[in-house]
């Protein structure tokens, strides 16, 4: 693992040096004319003709949590010894830009703490209505997962994310926006992926993952993938999205670590599980108010044991800058709340999981420098109608530079 990290570090160092050298040594460009700026993507080097650009950004996330940091997954998690933690939760290095043409773009994201290459992709974005992406990235399926953990409204994602996310996959995606600024303004994403999780260059059988997402920009304005209305939208901006995915593999769930299995699934035989899932999603921002909601359904067919299981879940999340109506409230302060409900098996009505969350965000410099304090309450009930509850408190400082 140490050697692997060393190779990755060397690769990134060579990549950074090489990109700057290419920009500086291009025959048609004098190195003295290279533009150096500090943007919302970190430091950026670019040529006057905009055909070459290179930006680099570092991101750190410090977190204090008690009695535990992670959301409980099973009833046994409620009985674990309390472990108050203070840690660097995330440390990322982001590199991106364009080469040869402004519309030929690239992006890399490296997890410094874990030594993992999270994202690597090339994008052809010459036309707004049709774009192509190849490589590895967070699958465009659910809003909560696509939004960067550094641009979320709460400290982290809800309990809904774990069972329903498609996370990072490798493959190809076709996407674009059609009929912009009209009542028929739509954004679409169609993906063909390996379906085996992060870093998996091949699938476990001959079945690929297929994902589709159709988003209606209902007011003729596209809503960015960020939490909180820090830009203070003067005009109402909202979306209604539908997404679906199908995959056959030896996994029933995915995470940043790759493929894995939900509780109750223990074997990993190639092609054992067929997973079909879908969601309906809404989001809205207007004058300091923000809203987002997802409703999920997922069906897992186990071909080895001849069983079927259906999972459902949803969350609602909203926030507001109360300084817009109350003079004594500081402008950088936002208050947000979340409720999530998850049913691991729709055939077992007694079993459910609930999460309540309340967050206070203080924005020093939008999402690039913010402090969040959050209190959460979990209430889980099992098949025997036995209930277990727990409170959690977290403080997090998010900074990018």
For the regions a protein language model found, what residue spans apply to each?
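Transmembrane beta-strand segments that form the barrel wall of outer-membrane beta-barrel proteins
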Residues: 99-118, 134, 188-196, 292-299, ...
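Hydrophobic, lipid-facing positions within transmembrane beta-strands of outer-membrane proteins
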Residues: 41-43, 54, 89-93, 118-120, ...
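Surface-exposed coil loops of outer-membrane beta-barrel proteins
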Residues: 72-80, 127-215, 222-233, 252-265, ...
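Gram-negative outer-membrane beta-barrel proteins
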Residues: 64-70, 103, 114-118, 140-144, ...
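Short loop/turn motifs that connect adjacent beta-strands in outer-membrane beta-barrel proteins
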Residues: 45-54, 100-104, 129, 141, ...
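Outer-membrane beta-barrel pore domains
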Residues: 27-31, 35, 234-401
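Beta-barrel outer-membrane channel/assembly domains of diderm bacteria
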Residues: 24-128, 172-179, 186-188, 264, ...
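Bacterial Sec-dependent N-terminal signal peptides
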Residues: 1-28
């Amino acid at each position: 693992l140490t050697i692997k990290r060393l190779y990755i570090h060397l690769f990134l160092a060579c990549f950074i040096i090489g990109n700057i050298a290419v920009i500086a040594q291009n025959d048609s460009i004098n190195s003295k004319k290279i533009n150096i700026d500090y943007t919302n993507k970190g430091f950026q080097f670019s040529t006057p003709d905009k055909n070459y650009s290179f930006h680099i950004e570092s991101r750190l996330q410090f977190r204090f949590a008690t009695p535990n940091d992670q959301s409980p997954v099973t009833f046994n998690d409620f009985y674990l010894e309390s472990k108050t933690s203070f840690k660097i939760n995330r440390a990322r290095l982001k590199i991106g830009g364009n080469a040869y043409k402004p519309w030929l773009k690239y992006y890399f994201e490296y997890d410094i703490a874990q030594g993992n290459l999270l994202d690597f992709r090339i994008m052809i974005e010459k036309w707004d209505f049709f774009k192509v992406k190849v490589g590895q990235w967070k699958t465009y399926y659910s809003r909560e997962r696509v939004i960067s953990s550094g641009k979320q409204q709460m400290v982290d994602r809800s309990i809904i994310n774990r069972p329903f996310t498609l996370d990072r996959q490798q493959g190809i995606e076709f996407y674009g926006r059609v009929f912009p600024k009209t009542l028929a303004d739509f954004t679409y994403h169609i993906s063909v992926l390996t379906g085996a999780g992060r870093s998996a260059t091949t699938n476990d059988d001959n079945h690929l993952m297929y994902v589709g997402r159709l988003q209606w920009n209902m007011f003729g304005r596209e809503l960015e993938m960020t939490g909180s209305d820090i830009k203070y939208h003067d005009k109402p901006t909202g979306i209604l999205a539908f997404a679906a995915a199908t995959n056959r593999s030896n996994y029933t769930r995915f995470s940043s670590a790759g493929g894995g299995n939900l509780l109750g699934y223990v074997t990993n035989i190639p092609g054992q599980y067929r997973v079909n899932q879908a969601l309906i999603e809404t989001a809205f921002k207007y004058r300091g108010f923000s809203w987002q909601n997802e409703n999920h359904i997922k069906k897992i067919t186990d071909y080895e044991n001849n069983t079927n299981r259906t999972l459902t879940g949803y969350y609602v999340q909203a926030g507001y800058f109360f300084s817009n109506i109350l003079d004594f409230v500081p402008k950088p302060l936002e208050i947000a709340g979340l409720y999530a409900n998850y049913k691991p098996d729709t055939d077992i009505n007694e079993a459910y999981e609930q999460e309540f969350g309340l967050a206070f965000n203080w924005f020093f410099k939008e999402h690039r420098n913010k402090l969040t304090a959050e209190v959460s309450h979990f209430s889980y009930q099992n098949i025997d109608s036995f209930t277990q509850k727990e409170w959690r408190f977290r403080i997090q400082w998010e900074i990018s530079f």
